[in-house]
């Protein structure tokens, strides 16, 4: 039996978001639909989820003491990380003291660090992955590259959105790649992973829900990446029945090994009928924003339903759908959007995230489209996103 209180009343059910970006905003909205009290936390003021939360706090989430203080102040029933850059050792302590970390503190800690999740997948679960080596010095980095061979990819073990990554084709790139990786890590200079290049036909995100009524899968989401960030995503990605079966089996093993209830974004490479594990996020995935238009329950609704202990039941996918990001480049603390009328219509929607400022390139919104085919849905979403003029 699941008991939910009413927000702002003594018996309220309280959810604290750690990270309040566009994904956290949609989680907050889904919590609001169920009368749940939402506290949004981030490193900067006026983050998107703060716009739709009951209260908000600005802290350095890598500071364990600051994190404990805000948790003790608000006394949440659920702590929901939206990003990786969090003091995960403190989350483990808080969980040991009886707090509910979503999906669980171990999953948050393992997936914060590429080494943790890669060793779990490849060494413990024996899943197919790219070849890899870890290095924490320039000399060991050179040895790792020599062992993997060219071409290869170097990434900080702790980074996101493509920061610090280099595709290495020759020895001439090694010094620069090492320095770039040191600059791109979330915790500053440190350890890197060197990966062999995987030959694949396409990448997918398999949104996988672990809930009280078992493990559920959304239709596979295809996506296109550029500079480490997604530009378009679509659903469903066509793949062979055998490849889909293998993808679901890999995703099931990963989420059950990580533990807890919630939605996981499992990233996979697909080549014919072969499937190779890439990464996993124990939370809604940016490529999954397409589910805001493609499913009866978005990835955000599924995440909330799962961590509150509610059954998922089934997931209905409506047909070909796509998302395309609005990614301007400018500097402004007073952003406006023109021509928005060209990004809405029949089977066409827009989400503007409400980020308070931009300095360079930043994802500020997404256009969602459905159509008779995935190809047409992608083109509709891209065209409409290109019509929106961002000014500041």
From Swiss-Prot:
Select a single GO molecular function from the record's annotations and give it: magnesium ion binding
Positions annotated to bind Mg(2+) = 267, 279
One biological process GO term for this chain?
Answer: 'de novo' IMP biosynthetic process
**Which residue pairs form cystines in this protein?**
none
Reaction catalysed by this enzyme: N(1)-(5-phospho-beta-D-ribosyl)glycinamide + formate + ATP = N(2)-formyl-N(1)-(5-phospho-beta-D-ribosyl)glycinamide + ADP + phosphate + H(+)
What keyword terms does UniProt attach to this protein? Answer: ATP-binding, Ligase, Magnesium, Metal-binding, Nucleotide-binding, Purine biosynthesis
| InterPro entries assigned | ATP-grasp (IPR011761), ATP-grasp_carboxylate-amine (IPR003135), ATP_grasp_subdomain_1 (IPR013815), PreATP-grasp_dom_sf (IPR016185), PurT (IPR005862), PurT/PurK_preATP-grasp (IPR054350), PurT_C (IPR048740), Rudment_hybrid_motif (IPR011054)
The reply on keyword S-adenosyl-L-methionine is: no
Q: Look up the EC number in the record and give it.
A: 6.3.1.21
Organism domain of life: Bacteria
**Sequence positions that bind N(1)-(5-phospho-beta-D-ribosyl)glycinamide:** 22-23, 82, 286, 355, 362-363
Which EC class heads this enzyme's classification? ligase
Q: Which GO terms describe its cellular component?
A: cytosol
Domain ATP-grasp, first and last residues per copy? 119-308
Family the UniProt entry places it in: Belongs to the PurK/PurT family.
Q: What this chain does, per the record?
A: Involved in the de novo purine biosynthesis. Catalyzes the transfer of formate to 5-phospho-ribosyl-glycinamide (GAR), producing 5-phospho-ribosyl-N-formylglycinamide (FGAR). Formate is provided by PurU via hydrolysis of 10-formyl-tetrahydrofolate.
State what protein this is by name: Formate-dependent phosphoribosylglycinamide formyltransferase
Natural source organism: Shigella flexneri
Taxonomic classification: Bacteria, Pseudomonadati, Pseudomonadota, Gammaproteobacteria, Enterobacterales
Gene label: purT
């Amino acid at each position: 039996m699941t008991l939910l209180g009413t927000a702002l009343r003594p018996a309220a059910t309280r959810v604290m978001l750690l990270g309040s970006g566009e994904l956290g905003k949609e989680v907050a909205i889904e919590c609001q639909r169920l009368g749940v009290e939402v506290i949004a936390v981030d490193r900067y003021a006026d983050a998107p989820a703060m716009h739709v939360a009951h209260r908000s706090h600005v802290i350095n989430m890598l500071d364990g003491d600051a994190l404990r203080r805000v948790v003790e102040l608000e006394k949440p029933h659920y702590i929901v990380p939206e990003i990786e850059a969090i003091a995960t050792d403190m989350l483990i302590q808080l969980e040991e003291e009886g707090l509910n970390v979503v999906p669980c503190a171990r999953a948050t800690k393992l997936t914060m660090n590429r080494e943790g999740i890669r060793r779990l997948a490849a060494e413990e679960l024996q899943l197919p992955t790219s070849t890899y080596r870890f290095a924490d010095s320039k000399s060991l980095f050179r040895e790792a590259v020599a062992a993997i061979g060219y071409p290869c990819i170097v990434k900080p073990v702790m980074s996101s959105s493509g920061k610090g990554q280099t595709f290495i084709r020759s020895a001439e790139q090694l010094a620069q790649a090492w320095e770039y990786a040191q600059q791109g890590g979330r915790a500053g200079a440190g350890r890197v992973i060197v990966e062999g290049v995987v030959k694949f036909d396409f990448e997918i995100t398999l949104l996988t829900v672990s809930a009280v009524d078992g493990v559920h899968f959304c239709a596979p989401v295809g996506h296109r990446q550029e500079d480490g960030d997604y530009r378009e995503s679509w659903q469903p990605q066509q793949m062979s029945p055998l490849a889909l079966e293998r993808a679901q089996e890999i995703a099931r093993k990963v989420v059950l090994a990580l533990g807890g209830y919630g939605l996981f974004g499992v990233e996979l490479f697909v080549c014919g009928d072969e499937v190779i594990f890439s990464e996993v996020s124990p939370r809604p995935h940016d490529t999954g924003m397409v589910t805001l238009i493609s499913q009866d329950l978005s990835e955000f609704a599924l995440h909330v339903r799962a961590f509150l202990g509610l059954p998922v039941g089934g997931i209905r996918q409506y047909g070909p759908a796509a998302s395309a990001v609005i990614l301007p480049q400018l500097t402004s603390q007073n952003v406006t959007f023109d021509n928005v009328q060209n990004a809405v219509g029949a089977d066409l929607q827009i989400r503007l995230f409400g980020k308070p400022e931009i300095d360079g390139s930043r994802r500020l919104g997404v256009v969602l489209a459905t159509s008779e085919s995935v190809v047409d849905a992608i083109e509709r979403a891209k065209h409409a996103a290109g019509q929106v003029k961002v000014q500041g």
